[in-house]
Each structure stands twice: as C-alpha cells, then as structure tokens.
From Swiss-Prot:
HAMAP family per the UniProt record, alphabetical: His_tRNA_synth (MF_00127), HisZ (MF_00125)
One GO cellular component, as annotated: cytoplasm
Organism of derivation: Pyrobaculum calidifontis (strain DSM 21063 / JCM 11548 / VA1)
Protein name (database record): Histidine--tRNA ligase
Subcellular location: Cytoplasm
EC number in record: 6.1.1.21
Amino-acid biosynthesis is among the record's keywords: no
Predominant location: cytoplasm
Highest taxon above the source species: Archaea
GO molecular function: ATP binding; histidine-tRNA ligase activity
Amino acid sequence: MSGLPDHLRRPVRGMRDWLPHQYYALQQLEALLSRVAESFGYRRVETPVVEHFEVLARKAGQEIVNEIYYFRDKAGRELGLRFDMTVPIARVVSYNLDLPRPIRWYYFTKVFRYDEPQHGRYREFYQFGVELIGSASPRADAEVVHLLAESLAAAGASNYVIKLNDRRVVDKLLEGMGLAAYKDVVYKALDKRYKAPREEVVGIMTRGGVPPSKAEELYEKATEMPLQEAVDFVTRIDKELGGFYAAFVKYLEAAVGLERLIFDLSIVRGLDYYTGVVFEAFAGEYKLAVGGGGRYDDLLQLYSGVKTPALGFAIGVERLMEAVGLQAVEKPLDYYIYIFDESAYQTAIYIARELRRKGYSAVVELGDKGLKDAFEYVLKIGTRFLVILGKKELEKGVVKVRDLQKREEVEKPIDEFIRGA
C-alpha cells in the first residue's frame, strides 16, 4: 500500500514540526522568559486561538487584516485565528472591567499570520510578551522597556539594541510640515527607512502625494540619535511631549541605563493601534529584529467604550532563538532497564516506579531488542545509566548499573541502588 505523497508528509507551508531536542530548547526559553516576567509581578494569561473576525480586524490596519487566517464556522460566524495577543487581551479586559488596575499580564503562546514565509519566520509562531494596562505614567513605559531589556539579556542576547520613538512626535512633526493628511503613507515609508533603498522610501511618499522636497526632508530627519539628544529634539517639536520624554528617559536611565537604547524617528510599528511610545528590539550578530511594542491608549475603548491607557511588547520566539543560537537542547533519559528474562519484568517495573517517584525518567525494555541492539539504541537517544537485570541478578537480588558517561559498571543490591539513586 502506498503512503502519502511527499507534500502531505511535510508540514503545511509556513508551519513547522518541533522535534524533542527543538521543543526542549523552546521550553528552556519559555522558562527563562516566564521567570523574568513573574519577577516583575506579571501573571500569565491565555486566550482562545479563535476570535471573532470583527474583534481582530477593528484596529489592526489593512496589511494585518490581509494576513488573518479567516473562516466561517458551521453556524456562519466570521472568525479568525489571533495574529497577536494584544487584541485578544484588550477584548478580555473589556469584558472584565472590574479587574484592579494596573493589570500586569504576560503570555507565551502561538499566534498566526498568513504572510510570506521567510527564513526564521513562520505563519504559525510563538510570541512571548507582556501587557501593562491602566497607567499613562512614563514610569509604565520605562517599566515595559526595562522588562524587554531584561528578557533579552536572560535569553542570552547580550548585544541587543532597543530603538525607541513616539508616534505623537511623528504626528506633531507632520503637522508642523503641513503633511498631517499624509500620515498613513509617511508611516508606511518610515517603516522601510532601513529596509529599502532611499529612492524607494522617498518614492512611497511622493507617490502618496507628499511633495518631493518634503519627502527628502522627512527621510533626512528619520535618523537615530542618543536618547538625551532626543529629549531636546522632541521638546522643540512640542513642549508637553518634551516633558513626557524627559521623564521617560530619566526613568529608563535609572532602570536599565541608556547604553543599549537609542531614539530612531523611523520606528513607527506596523499596527494601527499604537498611539504613543513605540520601540523595536534587535539582537544577534546580524541584529535581527526580534520584537517590539508600544503604547495603545485607544484600543481598549474600541471594545469597552472606556478610555484605558495601556502598553506592551511581544518577542518573536523563533527569531530570538535564532539570534541567540538556541536551536537544540538534549534531554537524556536517566535510566534504561534491560531485562533478559520474563521473570524479571515485575522487578523491573518496581525499580522503574521507584526511580520515577524520585524524579528520574526510566524506561523498561519492551522485549523487542537484544542487549547489543538495546545498547546501540540507548546511546543514540542519549541515556545516562543502563540497568541490566537477568535471571542471575534476580536470584542474587542485584542489578548491574552501567554509567554510560563514565563507562563504568557496578553491581548493587536492588534496594541499595534505589536508595542511592
């Protein structure tokens, strides 16, 4: 009988399988990042993978809407797979308005986007992130950036850089240049400032109606500068915003330092729900974009009708794993129990049970392999100890224990072996 064709045996395009050594690496990173979030007082949350399409599409922007996995269920309801966790969490909070504020939540979960798969980018992927809901203070912005920095450091991204901006600064700048009507096209162009040639970035603006001289001026202004200089830059554009930024930078300096933080006017983020401070994180030898976030003070009002300040960030887990070189974690089996004789099976089960109670992993040979094949098998899967139990050992009440790392073998009474394990 013929099996499935090759394309059906592979994952669906944009998806991936996680083999044990890959999944243990994922779990290791999950544990590290969860500890960081919980050390800041954040609590883990989960939401359904499936949401009403209207909830997802309400403030995402057309580009993201086009990437939603959309379908109708058997009742005819328009549904979609979540593309991030910020929108579902905003919905949850809108349905639970009596929750004490500020809310500090974090997540480590799967999200879905139907975009073009690339190296290190999938249509089904994991995100780790946090949401801080209920505070408009610049201390809240500083806390979230601080938590992002600590998360990157904990993951091993010691050379990370976080670039920050504020959409309100860009909006005020455009107002002063008489370009407020072109905000959307300017945002689209700025987002490509370091991803595309100058002519392409300027061309996006001019084709959208921005005068060529203004487009060139905006391109020149959309550069990087130290955060301390950014305070003066923002103050010249708007005094009130300058005051906010001065406090924000002061709190950042106290919390995380400014060495790895930089102001970049081209950082605007692709989601339409951002309203204030925005930022992106880069890590690894090639400075991969591994995450980002910002403030979304209007999003919850769309769902609850109540104005609620909020901000957060999300890290693309697979991208971060690539940036820090975390691709595989081996988890050896502790004990493999090989029995020569059927009469030893009950004793082998007893030994395995006692080892498991002590927190070890233990496997009893199923009877399909001879000792030579079993030995080759345990080496291939990664095993610390091979325990041998035959008729002679059973009569003497002992086991042979072979340490596969030290290449040593000892014989021990069964009870002594279990006590000393």
